Amino acid sequence: MKTWSFTQYEHLEYLQELTNANAKLKTIIGNDYMVAPDVVVYRMPIDDEELNRPFTVVDDETATMTEIRSINNSRPLLLASVSAKWTMRSDRAQNSRTEALNLIRNRKGQAPHIVVVTGEPLPSRIASLALGTGDIDCMYHFALYELVKAVEEYGAENGRDDIVEQLDTLIAGKRLKDISDLPLDLAI
């Protein structure tokens, strides 16, 4: 599914058509506005009958511009973009950050949740992406509890309290969570 398939980014389809038709425009604008998330979570707009169950919420005079109403919008709404990175080399971390910034910068309307799922075993590499200015909502580790145990054991055996502290900081700061938290966080 192309990013422009979603209501927040539908204008990018028109921009793509313009740049494809005009070489000068393409050299000026480029195409860095296009994002290809690994996984997307979206919902379709809802018809008024469903929205008005069990009592009236919308009518011809209220909520006339909201994209959640199917009468106003036929495209899906992007709720979350998930970047999947098995490991976190610095270039991979930068790709996730670039994807996130493009989604934030190029949207019209509500920003989707922007998260990264990883299996990276090194806290310093996780921190390279998890710490930052909020372009990534949160990182999720596919085996966080096992990682914490392994880092604590390694840190104790090798006098590396720094890596234990770094991992604790990421977790306490709500920058890193276990993958089991992801579905519930996206439900909010």
PLM feature segments, named:
Residues 2-73:
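Active-site metal-binding core of divalent-cation-utilizing nuclease and nuclease-like domains
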Residues 39, 78-84, 96:
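Conserved catalytic cores of phosphodiester-cleaving nucleases, focusing on short active-site segments
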Residues 43-45, 85-88, 118:
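Short, flexible loop/turn elements at secondary-structure junctions
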Residues 49-54, 87-99, 110, 124-127:
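Active-site-adjacent loop/helix micro-motif of nuclease/hydrolase catalytic cores
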Residues 64, 102-107:
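Substrate-engagement module of ASCE P-loop NTPases
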Residues 77-81, 108-111:
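Short, surface-exposed connector motifs at secondary-structure boundaries
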Residues 81-84, 89, 103:
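Conserved catalytic-core segments centered on acid/base and nucleophilic motifs
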Residues 106-188:
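C-terminal tail/extension regions appended to the core domain(s) of diverse proteins
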